[in-house]
Amino acid sequence: MTTAEEIKTRAREVMARELPEDYDPNVKDDEPLLSEGGVDSLGFIHVLTILEAEFGAHVPDEEWWDATSLDALAEVILRNQKQG
């Protein structure tokens, strides 16, 4: 079973790879990614789409913006993982 820590670690890796100019690797898990983390909204959607695929989740559109920090992102992915 996937843990929140695994999702946060992978999210950091994906952001560092996909958004090298924007992502701040020192952002804390509870800080907003769209301001302190340096990620813009298009970059955020790109990262979330990658994580959805990797963790077998389907995040409804109305929940995407709940994932404002790494902590919240992990929670949203875990809540929406497909069972089985």
Residue ranges and their predicted role:
Residues 41:
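Catalytic nucleophile serine of serine hydrolases
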Residues 65, 71-79:
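C-terminal structural segments of small proteins and small subunits
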Residues 33, 69-70:
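Short, structural beta-strand-to-alpha-helix junction motif
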Residues 1-24, 78-84:
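Thiotemplate assembly-line natural product biosynthesis machinery
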Residues 30-37:
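N-terminal helix-turn-helix DNA-binding core of bacterial DNA-binding proteins
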Residues 44-66:
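Phosphopantetheinylated carrier protein domains
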